[in-house]
């Protein structure tokens, strides 16, 4: 929403793998659905192909005619692979060992194209607990491909926010900069997100 507000002529390409968002949900949050294209994707290969095609077409346009554009992938962790889907269809009980390499290859290509087109991209992903770690730690799923390609990696955690009647009215979201080329790595901040029309509390913690 902030990107669209700051760029009145801009648009968002939303790659969606979780089937968790709809046009009505977008409009309820005050986002212009006409400036947001939802693209369902099921596999890493499908996402890579669709994203590259859009960027190639975008790069062919004269630079002065390009409108601001934002890519969003929600989420990387839910993307399958062509091999995994074929194995499921054929009832093969084997682990897909190609996923990490496919992710690394996809973002190796996309990072270059995104940079050339000056198109920012937001990727959501899952984390898991590191087993055997001396101190409790979490790691991002999908291998090292996205970790090395990303300019900024933010880990999010949440706790419930209650009012004076002990009713849950929102979440306190804690953000930790695991990687950043723009700010101090390891820095932590917290913000508050209300479930009602108040939304994100921009004054929380000040």
Predicted feature residues:
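Walker A/P-loop NTP-binding motif
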Residues: 1-6
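Conserved inter-motif catalytic segment of the P-loop NTP-binding fold
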Residues: 7-105
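Phosphate-binding/switch region of NTP-binding enzymes
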Residues: 96-205
């Amino acid at each position: 929403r902030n990107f669209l507000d700051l760029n009145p002529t801009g648009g968002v390409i939303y790659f969606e793998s979780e089937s968790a968002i709809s046009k009505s949900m977008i409009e309820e949050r005050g986002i212009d659905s006409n400036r947001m294209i939802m693209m369902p994707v099921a596999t890493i290969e499908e996402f890579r192909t669709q994203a590259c095609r859009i960027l190639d077409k975008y790069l062919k346009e004269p630079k002065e005619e390009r409108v601001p554009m934002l890519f969003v992938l929600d989420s990387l962790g839910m993307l399958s692979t062509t091999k995994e889907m074929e194995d499921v269809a054929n009832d093969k009980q084997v682990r897909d060992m190609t996923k990490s390499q496919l992710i690394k290859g996809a973002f190796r290509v996309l990072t270059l194209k995104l940079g050339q087109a000056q198109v920012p991209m937001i990727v959501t992903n899952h984390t898991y607990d590191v087993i055997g770690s001396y101190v409790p730690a979490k790691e991002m799923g999908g291998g090292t491909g996205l970790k090395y390609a990303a300019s900024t990696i933010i880990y999010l955690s949440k706790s419930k926010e209650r009012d004076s009647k002990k009713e849950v009215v929102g979440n306190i979201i804690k953000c930790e900069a695991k990687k950043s080329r723009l700010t101090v790595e390891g820095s932590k901040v917290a913000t508050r997100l209300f479930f009602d029309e108040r939304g994100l509390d921009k004054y929380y913690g000040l």
